[in-house]
Amino acid sequence: MKKYNDMKRKVFIAVMSLVVSGGLSGQSVYPGQHSGKLKKETIAPMQVKSFDLKDVRLLPSRFRENMMRDSMWMASIEVDRLLHSFRTNAGVFAGREGGYMTVKKLGGWESLDCELRGHTTGHLLSAYGLMYAATGSELFKHKGDSLVSGLAEVQNALGNGYLSAYPEELINRNIRGTSVWAPWYTLHKLGLIDQYLYSDNQKALEVVIRMADWAYHKLKPLDETTRQKMIRNEFGGVNESFYNLYAITGDERHRWLAQFFYHNEVIDPLK
């Protein structure tokens, strides 16, 4: 039993390392990557540029062993489990045979009483894109495509471009300045941009642009006092997501959204 627990602990550490590194490299757009997909390139002089994951393969090594171990875990997760809280929020289970009760639920942060639900799905959506780029395995392409299709279905059911595993009321609570657990941070981690950049999923880009349209119409009418009150709540790096989307689309509304999340109280004292 001890040996089994030690093995589980090692796998958990390895998986979390992938998730953390995927969050760093997958959520950012580095100069030199994603040729042909960016309308706004970096104009600052760069001495070193990054490379695309698809252009590199790991040779037999501890790193490759860990990557393949992680890939086995990622491959084992059922897409329906990752979508269950999103589908529940949109009410789409009503049209499915067996409905909600047929899905084996995720717990912890993904439980339906947790305001961070949807977080794990987003991290894995990024990870599937990264793993597909790093290995070329169509399995991870299929996993990512299936998740994106499921999320698009949820977005269509919700109707206004909003997409999440929790009700829009959590965003409204954030805007009012009342207690809520990081709804913008969870949207930041959703991973749709990564699916477009790393897996060439055009539908993922369409879904995230609709989300940005919703966010723009939601936030544009807010005054400065309301904005400052709203961003006192943890919002992660959602501004980075909007800047990355702006780099892809060139749409000035996406840059406006990124600038909207400029946190004066934190950044200004550092000047």
Task: List each language-model region with its residue ranges.
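Bacterial Sec-dependent N-terminal signal peptides
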Residues: M1-P31
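Glycan-recognition and catalytic cores of secretory/periplasmic carbohydrate-active enzymes
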Residues: Q27-K271
